[in-house]
UniProtKB/Swiss-Prot annotation:
PANTHER family recorded: SHIKIMATE KINASE, SHIKIMATE KINASE 1, CHLOROPLASTIC
Keyword line: Amino-acid biosynthesis, Aromatic amino acid biosynthesis, ATP-binding, Cytoplasm, Kinase, Magnesium, Metal-binding, Nucleotide-binding, Transferase
GO biological process, one term: chorismate biosynthetic process
Gene assigned in the entry: aroK
Protein name: Shikimate kinase
Purpose: Catalyzes the specific phosphorylation of the 3-hydroxyl group of shikimic acid using ATP as a cosubstrate.
Cofactor descriptive note: Binds 1 Mg(2+) ion per subunit.
Signal peptide: none
Binding site for Mg(2+): 29
Annotated InterPro entries: P-loop_NTPase, Shikimate/glucono_kinase, Shikimate_kinase/TSH1, Shikimate_kinase_CS
Coiled-coil regions listed in the entry: none
EC nos: 2.7.1.71
Predominant cellular place of this UniProt entry's protein: cytoplasm
Catalytic activity of the protein: shikimate + ATP = 3-phosphoshikimate + ADP + H(+)
Length: 183
């Protein structure tokens, strides 16, 4: 990408942020890092930020504070990071549960929904022990349930929806760069 293209994306829409939403394992962090690098923007990941702020892993937060405590921390992190300019942010999969998070994301940046089938998400996450919501007897059923609940919320907040089931991260980044230049 040329410097001119990067400058165009940077200045359009008054220096809007780019937020990636989707279920765990959708590729938000991988795509976000590559996109930030291509646009010369800082990259943040809400889960990483929460771990940095608390000094403990996400599963520990879930064990001590429950999902409700984690969601409060996530909402504060979203509030803080959406005040930044020109960042790329990979959000946690449940960020859209909170209506205020959805409003802040939609109003302060371009929201990209990486939609991936629950079966593929299961393949990507089945060996990952840092996913508290998947510590259940049937993780695939849990992913299907989460997808059915959250998909409408992701679509509500998204400016761009990408089917991430059939594209590698670099292909998604190329697609997004073209889309941002059309906005």
């Amino acid at each position: 990408m040329s410097t001119q293209d990067s400058a165009k994306i940077t200045t359009v829409e008054h220096r809007r942020n780019i937020y990636l939403v989707g279920l765990m394992g959708a590729g938000k962090t991988t795509v976000g890092r590559q996109l930030a690098r291509r646009l010369s923007r800082p990259f943040f990941d809400t889960d990483h930020e929460i771990v940095e702020r608390t000094g403990v892993p996400i599963p520990t937060i879930f064990e001590i504070e429950g999902e409700e405590g984690f969601r409060r921390r996530e909402a504060q992190t979203i509030y803080d990071l959406t005040a930044e300019n020109n960042i790329v942010l990979a959000t946690g999969g449940g960020v859209v549960i909170n209506p205020e998070n959805r409003r802040r994301l939609h109003d302060t940046g371009w929201v990209v929904y990486l939609n991936v089938s629950p079966v593929l998400l299961y393949e990507r996450t089945r060996h990952d022990r840092n996913r508290p919501l998947l510590r259940v007897e049937d993780p695939l059923a849990k992913l299907e349930e989460l997808h059915s609940i959250r998909d409408p919320l992701y679509r509500e907040v998204a400016h761009i929806v990408v089917d991430g089931s059939h594209l590698v991260a670099s292909g998604i980044v190329q697609y997004l760069l073209r889309e941002f230049n059309r906005l």
